[in-house]
A protein has these predicted regions:
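Short, acidic Ser/Thr/Gly-rich low-complexity loop/linker segments typical of extracellular
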Residues: 59-73
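Short, acidic, small-residue-rich periplasmic hinge/interaction motif at the N-terminus
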Residues: 40, 52-56, 89-93, 107-147, ...
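Transmembrane beta-strands of outer-membrane beta-barrel pores
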Residues: 244-248, 263, 274-278, 335-341, ...
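N-terminal periplasmic accessory domains that precede
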Residues: 108-113, 123, 127, 153-159, ...
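Outer-membrane beta-barrel signature, preferentially recognizing the C-terminal barrel domain
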Residues: 523, 533-582, 589-591, 611-625, ...
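Periplasmic plug
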Residues: 172-213
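Face-selective signature of the C-terminal outer-membrane beta-barrel domain
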Residues: 312-340, 363-502, 506-512, 516-522, ...
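Outer-membrane beta-barrel translocator/receptor signature
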Residues: 220-227, 235-284, 310-313
Length: 790
C-alpha cells in the first residue's frame, strides 16, 4: 500500500512538473530573430534590385515586408513567430516561398536564385538601375532613399521623372503631363482620379509602371500615357493622412483628409478633398478685329483688377472585398460639389471707321453643380493565364450656369443654363497570357443624355436635349521577337450623336503600335504609331444660338464629323548610372479638326443680320512637327538631381478660308537637392510650350517656383515661393488667327506673383501598409454637355 502511495505521489509530481514546463514553453516570450539573404538572377549573373520579400505567419497574416537593396541584399529584424513563410518575388520572374517551423534563431538564407518567367524572359530588358523596359511600358522600382526623400506620391514622381521619358510635373500646380497631355492614373491597374493618387501613402508604393504610349483601352480619354502605381502587399491596419497647403500672401487653400483600413478580406477607404481660391488681381488684356462690315471693328480691351472665386469639395467612399486571391469585388461612391464665380472688369476702346467708343465692361460667370457617381467592379481569375473583368459606372450631374455682361453704355446681356445630364458605361475585359505573348480583348458601351434649358435676359426658355451612344470593341497583343518588343492594338468604334429631331452615326477604326528595340544595356529605341478618330463633345452639337455680346453670337453644329489624329514618334533613350537622356522627334496630323469659325451674317432676312456668328466646324487639317531633347543627372554626390528639357515645334493650320504656319521654341530646367531630413527644389520655365486647337494657338503656363521641405517623423513641412521676382504672376497667352475675327489675349493673376505657400502634412499609420488587389477599372470621363466659356 505504501509502495503504491509513493508511486502515485511520484507520478503526480511528474505530471505537475510537465504541465508547469509546458506552460513556461508556451507563455514565456520567444526571442526575436533576424532574417537576411541575397536575391540574384543566375541566368544573367546579376543581383535583383527591388525584389519584394514578404514574411507571413499564415496565408492571410503578413508580419513584415521589405525590398532588396542596390546589392540585391535584404534584412528583416525582430521576427518573433516560430512558424513563418518567406515569399520572394520580382517583376518578370518566378517567385518562390520557403517555410520555417519552430524557429527561434537568426536565419541566413544565403543566395536565392529567381528564374525569369518563360513567357516574359524575352520581353524584359534592364536599361538602368531599378528600370526595366518591357514591350509596352517602363517598370521603375523606387529605392528606399528615393522614397524617404519625399513626402507624397506626386513628389516621388518628380524624383523619378528622369527615368520616365516625356513626363512633366509641376508640383506647385499639381499638374502631370506626358508629351503635353494628361495621363491615365491607375492604382494596381485600376483607373483612378488624380486626387486618389495624391492621397496615396507613398511609402507603400512598390513600383511604378509607366507608359508614354496611350493605351488603346483608354485612348478616347485624350491621354498621353499611363502611370500605374503598384502597391505593397496588404496587411491588417491602415493609415490616416491629413495635409493642407495654405498661401500666406493671398487667399488660396488646398487640403485633403484620407483614411484607409484593411482587415482580413476587406478594405474600407474614405477621402475628402477641398480647394478654395479667391483671387482679386486677375487681368485679361485682349485685342480683336471684326472683319466683314463696311469698316473693320477694332476692339482693344484693357484688363482691370478682377476677381475669381472657386470652391470645390469631393468625397470618395470605396469598399473592396477579396473573396479569395482570384476573386475580387469593388464598389465606390463619389460625390463632387463645385462652385465658381468670376467677375471680370475691363476698359474697352472700340473703333468703327472714324467713330470711337469708350466704355467699361463687366463680364461675369457663375457655375455650380452636384455630381454623384457609382462605380462597380468585379474581377475573376479563370486560371493562371486567364482573367475576366466586369465594370459598370454611372454618373449624374445637375447644375446651373450663368454668363452675363454689363457695359457702361447701358448694354446688358445675361444667359442662363440649367443642365441635367447622366451617363452609364459598361465594360467587359478578357485577358490571356501565352508562352511568348499576352492578349486582352474588350467591349465597351456608353450611353449619355444631356438636357440643357436656356434663357436669355429672363426671356422664354428653350430646351435642348442631346444624346450620345458609343460602342467600342478592341484587342491588344504584346510580345517580343528577340530584342524587339512590340504592342499592337486595333479597335472599332461606332458613334451615334443625336438631338431631339436628328441623329448621325459614324464608324471609325482605331489603332496603336509600339516597338521597343534594346540596343544593349544602356540604349533603347522606341517607335510609336497612333491612328485615333475622336468624337466632339456634346456641347459642340447644340444648334441653340446664344448671344456673346452686342455684335456676336455663337452656336454648335450637329453636322460636325469626328476628328482623326495620326501620330508618328521616334524616341532614343539612354540610361547609365546617374545619367538619363532622350532625343525624340514626332509628326502628327489632325484631319477634320474642330474649329470655331467666324462669319459675318450679311443676309438681311436672317434674324442675326449684321452680327458675327461663331460656329463649330471641321477644318481641313492641323500639322505639328516637334523635336525635343532631355538630359538629366540623379543623385549627384548623393545630394543633387537636375533635368534640362528643350524643344522646337512647328504648327501648320489649314481650313476652307485660312492657312497659317507658326514655329515656337520651349525650354525648362528643374533642380532637386536633399540633405538628411531637408530637401530643396526649383522649377524654371525658360520658355513655355505651345499647343493648337483649330485656329487657336495657346501658350503653356509659364509658372516658376522654388521651395524647401523638412521631414520629422510623421510630419512634413514645406515652404514654397511661386513666380518670384515678377509683378504679373503666371501668364497665359492665346492667339486666334481667324481671317474674320483675329485676336490676341494675355491672361494673368497678380495674386500669384511672389506668392508664399506653407504646406503641412501628418500621416498616422496603424498596423501595416496596405495594398488593393490588382484590377483594371475604367471610369470614363464625364461630358456634361454644357459650355459656359464662349
Amino acid at each position: 500500500m505504501e509502495y503504491h502511495y509513493l508511486l502515485n505521489k511520484r507520478i503526480s509530481f511528474v505530471k505537475q512538473a510537465f504541465i508547469v514546463g509546458l506552460s513556461l514553453f508556451f507563455f514565456l516570450p520567444i526571442k526575436a530573430y533576424h532574417i537576411r539573404g541575397k536575391v540574384v538572377d543566375p541566368t544573367q549573373k546579376q543581383t535583383l534590385i527591388g525584389a519584394n520579400v514578404v514574411v507571413k505567419k499564415d496565408s492571410t497574416t503578413i508580419l513584415k515586408t521589405t525590398q532588396t537593396d542596390e546589392n540585391g541584399c535584404f534584412s528583416i529584424k525582430d521576427i518573433a513567430e516560430p512558424n513563418i513563410s518567406i515569399a520572394i518575388s520580382y517583376f518578370g520572374y518566378k517567385g518562390i516561398t520557403l517555410h520555417y517551423y519552430g524557429n527561434s534563431s537568426d536565419i541566413d538564407m544565403g543566395t536565392i536564385h529567381l528564374l525569369p518567367e518563360t513567357q516574359q524572359l524575352k520581353e524584359v530588358t534592364v536599361i538602368g538601375k531599378r528600370v526595366i523596359q518591357k514591350a509596352d511600358k517602363y517598370v521603375i522600382i523606387p529605392s528606399e532613399e528615393e522614397i524617404n526623400r519625399v513626402s507624397a506620391s506626386i513628389s516621388l514622381l518628380n524624383e523619378l521623372k528622369l527615368k520616365m521619358p516625356g513626363l512633366r510635373i509641376n508640383e506647385a500646380l499639381q499638374t502631370i503631363t506626358i508629351d503635353g497631355s494628361a495621363p491615365v492614373f491607375m492604382i494596381n491597374g485600376k483607373k483612378q482620379p488624380l486626387s486618389k493618387v495624391q492621397g496615396l501613402n507613398h511609402q507603400d508604393i512598390l513600383r511604378i509602371e509607366y507608359s508614354n504610349t496611350p493605351d488603346l483601352r483608354h485612348i478616347d480619354d485624350g491621354n498621353g500615357g499611363v502611370i500605374n502605381f503598384i502597391m505593397k502587399t496588404p496587411v491588417q491596419g491602415g493609415f490616416i493622412m491629413a495635409n493642407t497647403n495654405q498661401a500666406i500672401t493671398t487667399m488660396r487653400n488646398r487640403s485633403q483628409l484620407t483614411g484607409s483600413y484593411f482587415k482580413k478580406k476587406s478594405e474600407w477607404s474614405i477621402q475628402y478633398n477641398t480647394t478654395w481660391r479667391n483671387s482679386k488681381k486677375v487681368y485679361d488684356n485682349k485685342n480683336e478685329r471684326f472683319i466683314g462690315r463696311e469698316y473693320d471693328i477694332i476692339r482693344r480691351q484693357e484688363g482691370l483688377p478682377s476677381t475669381t472665386k472657386d470652391f470645390d469639395n469631393s468625397v470618395l467612399l470605396s469598399y473592396t472585398y477579396m473573396y479569395d486571391p482570384s476573386t475580387m469585388l469593388m464598389a465606390s461612391l463619389d460625390l463632387k460639389l463645385h462652385h465658381k464665380k468670376d467677375c471680370e472688369d475691363n476698359r474697352i476702346v472700340e473703333q468703327y471707321g472714324s467713330s470711337v467708343e469708350r466704355y467699361t465692361k463687366n463680364y461675369y460667370t457663375n457655375s455650380h453643380y452636384t455630381s454623384p457617381s457609382l462605380d462597380l467592379f468585379f474581377k475573376k481569375a479563370l486560371s493562371k493565364t486567364q482573367t475576366i473583368e466586369l465594370n459598370s459606372v454611372g454618373r449624374w450631374s445637375n447644375g446651373d450656369y450663368t454668363r452675363g455682361m454689363r457695359n457702361s453704355n447701358l448694354y446688358h446681356q445675361e444667359n442662363n443654363t440649367h443642365n441635367n445630364s447622366w451617363n452609364m458605361t459598361h465594360e467587359v475585359l478578357y485577358t490571356q497570357l501565352f508562352k511568348t505573348l499576352s492578349t486582352k480583348w474588350g467591349a465597351n458601351y456608353s450611353h449619355q443624355v444631356a438636357e440643357n434649358n436656356y434663357a436669355e435676359n429672363s426671356g422664354k426658355r428653350v430646351t435642348d436635349k442631346l444624346f450620345k451612344d458609343d460602342i467600342y470593341l478592341y484587342g491588344v497583343v504584346s510580345g517580343a521577337l528577340k530584342s524587339l518588343g512590340y504592342t499592337v492594338g486595333l479597335g472599332g468604334k461606332m458613334y451615334r450623336n443625336a438631338t431631339a429631331t436628328r441623329s448621325k452615326t459614324f464608324f471609325r477604326l482605331k489603332t496603336t503600335a509600339t516597338f521597343n528595340y534594346a540596343m544593349g544595356r544602356n540604349w533603347s529605341l522606341n517607335y510609336l504609331f497612333m491612328y485615333n478618330p475622336s468624337q466632339p463633345s456634346l456641347a459642340n452639337f447644340s444648334n441653340v444660338v446664344q448671344t456673346i455680346d452686342r455684335i456676336s453670337v455663337q452656336m454648335g453644329n450637329v453636322n460636325v464629323k469626328p476628328s482623326v489624329w495620326t501620330r508618328n514618334r521616334l524616341l532614343l533613350l539612354f540610361n547609365k548610372n546617374h545619367i538619363s537622356s532622350s532625343l525624340q522627334t514626332s509628326y502628327s496630323v489632325t484631319t477634320n479638326p474642330l474649329v470655331n469659325t467666324y462669319q459675318y451674317i450679311s443676309d438681311a432676312a436672317s434674324p442675326y443680320h449684321g452680327l458675327f456668328m461663331k460656329k463649330t466646324e471641321n477644318g481641313k487639317n492641323d500639322r505639328h512637327f516637334n523635336v525635343e531633347y532631355s538630359v538629366g543627372m540623379q543623385n549627384i554626390a548623393q545630394h543633387l538631381s537636375f533635368q534640362l528639357i528643350t524643344g522646337w515645334s512647328r504648327f501648320s493650320m489649314e481650313g476652307s478660308n485660312y492657312r497659317h504656319h507658326v514655329s515656337k521654341m520651349y525650354a525648362s530646367i528643374s533642380l532637386n537637392g536633399y540633405w538628411k531630413h531637408w530637401s530643396a527644389f526649383a522649377n524654371i520655365d525658360l520658355a513655355p510650350q505651345y499647343s493648337i486647337w483649330g485656329t487657336n494657338l495657346y501658350s503653356g503656363t509659364k509658372y516658376n517656383y522654388m521651395g524647401v521641405k523638412y521631414h520629422l517623423k510623421n510630419w512634413d513641412f514645406g515652404l514654397r515661393l511661386d513666380n518670384p521676382l515678377t509683378k504679373r504672376g503666371f501668364i497665359q497667352c492665346a492667339e486666334n488667327i481667324s481671317n474674320v475675327v483675329p485676336s490676341h489675349s494675355e491672361y494673368y493673376i497678380s495674386d500669384m506673383a511672389n506668392m508664399v505657400e506653407l504646406s503641412i502634412q501628418y500621416r498616422l499609420p496603424f498596423g501595416k501598409a496596405y495594398k488593393k488587389a490588382n484590377r483594371t477599372l475604367r471610369n470614363k470621363n464625364f461630358d456634361a454637355g454644357v459650355n459656359n466659356e464662349y
